[in-house]
A protein has these predicted regions:
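Generic structural detector for well-ordered beta-strands
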Residues: 7-11, 38, 52, 65-67, ...
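Short, highly charged C-terminal tails/helix-capping segments
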Residues: 136-145
């Protein structure tokens, strides 16, 4: 099993960063490795989203169910993709009106060793920088307001 556990306190209000991360459809606009992203459904505080990744000439996609509590939490569970296991959660802790602690915990395992050998280095690289990518975009949005 592989794990990601990251957190950072940022000078962005909780609503801005939560909405950015919860809007799967917008990922393709600012995440360089995201070839496409879409929301299949959004109802009863559950989003079904699909992300297509393209990096180092390798393309793949996966779909997750994202159960959310507005401005608090997003819980991710794999629906389909090259993983035998993928689940995790984003947590948002409002520190004050302008500051938020954002945390990501993710655990994953690829379907088999061949897939793992080709995708793990790419996925690990993406996961190492994902929080920074969302924070950079949140600051861009904040500065435009």
């Amino acid at each position: 099993m592989n794990y990601i556990d990251k957190s950072e306190e940022i000078n962005v209000n909780v609503g801005t960063i939560f909405n950015l991360i919860n809007n799967v459809d917008g990922y393709k606009e600012f995440l360089p490795w995201c070839k496409n992203s879409s929301i299949e459904s959004n109802s009863n505080e559950v989003i079904i989203g699909e992300i297509e990744i393209s990096k180092n000439l390798i393309n793949w996609k996966f779909k997750t169910s994202n159960k959310y509590i507005i401005d608090k939490k997003i819980v991710l569970e794999l629906i389909e993709g090259p993983f035998s296991h993928l689940c995790g959660e984003w947590n948002f802790e409002k520190k004050d009106k302008f500051n938020t602690k954002v945390s990501l915990y993710l655990e994953y395992q690829f379907d088999n060793k061949i897939i793992e050998m080709s995708l793990k280095p790419i996925f690990s690289s993406i996961m190492d920088s994902i929080l920074d990518s969302f924070i950079s975009e949140a600051f861009r949005i904040k500065n435009e307001q």
